[in-house]
């Protein structure tokens, strides 16, 4: 455990490095510290911090920079979320105050807002139930002109639809009977269980009311694929490369591959019970992320699940500022999505 003075020196080293990206020496630190301490005393304390691997020396400078261990100590013990100013809070509220037809529209917009606020790469995730999501209701809709649409409402109020072509003409009573049959067989089942149901005798019975069964099944399969997918959105990918200077092509290729891989994204984010968590450099499995940090925030929507947001930026980011943005943003997003669900439930 560090002493109060050692903690203060470490904090000022990290705060200065986040602003300048330049190693700092004892003389410059002496001018910044709020207490009167000689350069010699600071050098001694920095030697202790260096010996304990909280700071390290670069080959190109006599000054010191934070180490991974130093950043971890700083994040866990010294960095406090900065309060967001009124202007930025109003910007978030205004941008989330649009007319949205689906949750995913809000979540997609959120990624753009968060990236714009920070100039970092932002990820936003649709709320996910802690238990498996099941079908709440299914509806067949006749669109006319040989087109039909199937609409599925999930337990978390996620709504997905898919239109399909039909070769037969249908009257309302046929669609009503087909819809009733489908709801009897599918309500309460997960996407995985629904796939198994369609391998059973239900298709024979459904064909009685809906001869275009093959087209319907293809539409259902398209919806189930969307439901099974993690619903997340990314904005500002190029910021990752601009923030940390020149990057080699293989690293860029690896990062883009990660962004387009659900498993890669899941492995990237910190698994934590805390509302806000931070994962840094050496804690990533991939060497090409050693210069980055990820701040993840979650928001609890009760019966509607838990949503997540994340920021990816350079490890020398201003943690108080970014923690403050993530904290304020997750609260605003929770309020906006809660309002959507309230209007939907009415």
UniProtKB/Swiss-Prot annotation:
GO biological process, one term: negative regulation of DNA-templated transcription
Pfam families: HrcA, HrcA_DNA-bdg
Alphabetic keyword roster: Repressor, Stress response, Transcription, Transcription regulation
Keyword Cell cycle carried by entry: no
Ranges annotated as spanning the membrane: none
NCBIfam families attached to this UniProt entry: hrcA
Protein name according to UniProt: Heat-inducible transcription repressor HrcA
Species annotation: Fructilactobacillus sanfranciscensis
């Amino acid at each position: 455990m560090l002493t109060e003075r050692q903690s203060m020196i470490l904090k000022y080293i990290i705060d200065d490095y986040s602003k300048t990206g330049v190693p700092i020496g004892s003389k410059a630190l002496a001018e910044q510290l709020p207490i009167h301490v000689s350069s010699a005393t600071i050098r001694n304390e920095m030697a202790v911090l260096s010996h304990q691997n909280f700071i390290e020396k670069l080959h190109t400078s006599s000054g010191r920079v934070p180490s991974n261990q130093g950043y971890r100590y700083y994040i866990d013990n010294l960095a406090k979320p900065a309060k967001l100013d009124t202007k930025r809070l109003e910007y978030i509220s205004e941008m989330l105050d649009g007319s949205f037809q689906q949750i995913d529209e809000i979540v997609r917009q959120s990624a753009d807002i968060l990236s714009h606020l920070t100039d970092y790469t932002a990820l936003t995730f649709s709320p996910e139930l802690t238990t498996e999501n099941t079908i709440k209701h299914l509806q067949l809709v006749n669109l006319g002109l040989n087109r039909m649409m199937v609409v599925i409402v999930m337990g978390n109020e996620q709504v997905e639809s898919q239109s399909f072509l039909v070769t037969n003409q249908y009257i309302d009573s046929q669609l009503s009977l087909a819809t009733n049959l489908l709801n009897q067989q599918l309500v309460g089942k997960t996407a995985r269980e629904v796939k198994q149901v369609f391998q059973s005798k239900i298709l024979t019975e459904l064909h009685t009311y809906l001869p275009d069964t093959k087209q319907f099944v293809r539409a259902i399969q398209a919806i189930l694929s969307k439901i099974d997918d993690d619903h997340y959105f990314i904005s500002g990918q190029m910021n990752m490369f601009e923030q940390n200077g020149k990057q080699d092509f293989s690293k860029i290729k690896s990062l883009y591959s990660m962004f387009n891989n659900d498993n890669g994204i899941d492995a990237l984010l910190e698994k934590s019970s805390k509302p806000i968590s931070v994962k840094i450099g050496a804690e990533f499995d991939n060497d090409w992320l050693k210069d980055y940090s990820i701040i993840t925030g979650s928001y609890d929507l009760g019966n509607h699940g838990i949503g997540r947001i994340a920021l990816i930026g350079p490890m020398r980011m201003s943690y108080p500022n970014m923690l403050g943005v993530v904290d304020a943003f997750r609260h605003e997003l929770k309020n906006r999505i809660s309002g959507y669900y309230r209007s939907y439930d009415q």
